[in-house]
Amino acid sequence: MLNKNCLFLQVNIHLDEPRPCPLGMGFVEYQPCQPKSMRKLQIEELCRMTVEEFRAAEKLPLTIILDNIRSLHNVGSVFRTADAFRLERVCLCGITACPPSAEMHKTALGAEDSVSWTYYSDALEAVRELQAQDYCVLAVEQVQGSIGLDAFRPESGRKYALVLGNEVKGVQQAVVDACGQSLEIPQYGTKHSLNVSVSAGIVIWEVAKGMRSLRDLQSVALRP
């Protein structure tokens, strides 16, 4: 049973040299069931990068491949998540729409301008190109022999790419075959189905968290 008096706080990912914040925004240590007085932060307190700062900043070596995503809102949401975790690039493949797009902007909120992207006529082309550049490319799909996301541990020094598939058909079988490994989000309900942008948020957070933890341990954390 959920204790309504418990306080849940966002987990902080420390950077070696955080950007200066004039109003001193920061996270506090989590203390179970210790309610505190809290005030919502204003926009100017969030220490957000400018688009130019984002483009110049070091990125997490993680790329997202979108395989025939039909909804512009889903594409925009993935851009926004990629911006949030400072990912390298988004690969837009097949029928996946490219910026600029008013519909995409509704969910991307400008992240389509900050995050680098490349268009490929087929996701298989993107997979093979990234593999040739020594990326470990993983499909996000329900397959035999998939790796549970909760069990996945990124390797130190590796570059990764994640393939997310069409809202109805998922990742193409040929792309799954080319990847050779697949991540699956454990699910416990009746549907065993998540919206692709929701799946993207879950998987990107989990993989990025593991990759950043390794980099922090090596004292080479991302710097703005």
Region spans (language model):
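Post-transcriptional modification and biogenesis factors for structured RNAs
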Residues: 7-10, 20-224
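Hydrophobic alpha-helical membrane-insertion segments
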Residues: 1-2, 13-16
